[in-house]
Amino acid sequence: MNVPVEKNSSFSKELQQTLRSRHLLRTELSFSDEMIEWHIKNGYITAENSISINKRRYRCNRCGQTDQRYFSFYHSSGKNKLYCRSCVMMGRVSEEVPLYSWKEENESNWKSIKLTWDGKLSSGQQKAANVLIEAISKKEELLIWAVCGAGKTEMLFPGIESALNQGLRVCIATPRTDVVLELAPRLKAAFQGADISALYGGSDDKGRLSPLMISTTHQLLRYKDAIDVMIIDEVDAFPYSADQTLQFAVQKARKKNSTLVYLSATPPKELKRKALNGQLHSVRIPARHHRKPLPEPRFVWCGNWKKKLNRNKIPPAVKRWIEFHVKEGRPVFLFVPSVSILEKAAACFKGVHCRTASVHAEDKHRKEKVQQFRDGQLDLLITTTILERGVTVPKVQTGVLGAESSIFTESALVQIAGRTGRHKEYADGDVIYFHFGKTKSMLDARKHIKEMNELAAKVECTD
């Protein structure tokens, strides 16, 4: 329903709430043309060209796309009109359609917020929390480089509490919807009574502006100059690491004078280089919250595993390893390089006496299968790299079939190894890279984990 403008009125608070710190198309605004024009004329709203054209070079002002291959034309009202294909899934941006924003500075008006989490941080977590609070006060960039299972979410809590009570808006941005769904209930439990929104495609909160936001990086395309403290979780994860439009979305959604925090167990080389050279403020947490060393991966040669799978056979070394752990009541993750190999492996395991399922990115029942695995209803879960992050299962043992495959980068292998040993009661466990020839990525991943364990022992972060 279009909301009309009242004669002789001041600005519309409803329109202000809709547009403040946002970057929206006309189709996303349920207000009359008269109202919008009045607010533009009186200086409350800016209407910015959606696409900038300079010497026949195009730039999308919503997603920042400048690659000319992403621009095309559609026919409307007898004309060919330019539009951006890069962000079209969020509503079509074209040369004749403006992006609207509210011009006034967004002032916070929420009540003081108290952390309701009653856990205790480890010394390493507390160190990171203190550095984060300092970075927020100084509006700095910060890298929190913490191993898988270090309790990265919990170490953010004191900094989030401090920021919210200064009237600063905080956003945790992550490349994956799965992570938003996992983090949202934890943050709502830790900050009971706070207004928290979870933003992802299809969410009820989509487009909301709240003091604490957990968002996919895609959803940030709808915001502009909104965030005081931007925390990028899994900065090295796909698709954020490979998509410049998502990196642009983060920068556009931040206020000009704001804090930017990178959170990762496996930071990209450029961030790592800057941190080690002192060009980027950083804090390194080399141990898990339970103070036990990271399980170090072992390499196990399994021959021509592809040939065996094509003959509907499981490599004997892999089969023996899985059967041993299943017999002992320990669940097993088996990572494979592709969906086609996953399907072959799943078919082969039908003849093995264990409760088995397989998952990949397009699996409609992925969420249910992962929950069954967590609940102990499955013995073996075969998966692609879609589950390399964010899944915690007690007592789980982790194997990689075809660890020499190019999909298994150093970062991916470190993340996969991080599935094992996350619980205090089950802090050790097996991590096996089954291979048909070692690769540099395999060696680098093992070296990475060994170095973290050595550093943790040196600074007395492990028992």
From Swiss-Prot:
It holds the Pfam family DEAD. May help stabilize the protein. A motif (DEAD box) lies at residues 233-236. Zn(2+) binds at residues 60, 63, 84, 87. It is an enzyme of class 3 (hydrolase). ATP binds at residues 146-153. Changing residue 60 to S: 10-fold decrease in transformation efficiency. Coiled coil: none annotated. Induction: Part of the comF operon, encoding comFA, comFB and comFC, transcribed in competence media (minimal salts plus glucose) once stationary phase is reached; transcription requires comA and degU. Expression activated by ComK. One of its GO terms (molecular function) is 3'-5' DNA helicase activity. Residues 317-463 form the Helicase C-terminal domain. Residues 133-285 form the Helicase ATP-binding domain. Its cofactor is Zn(2+). One of its GO terms (cellular component) is cytoplasm. One of its GO terms (biological process) is DNA replication. InterPro entries: DEAD/DEAH_box_helicase_dom, Helicase_ATP-bd, Helicase_C-like, P-loop_NTPase, PriA_helicase. Belongs to the DEAD box helicase family. Monomer and dimer in solution. Interacts with DprA and ComFC; ComFA-ComFC form rings about 150 Angstroms in diameter with apparent 6-fold symmetry. This is Competence protein ComFA. It comes from Bacillus subtilis (strain 168). The lineage of its organism: Bacteria, Bacillati, Bacillota, Bacilli, Bacillales. The gene is comFA.
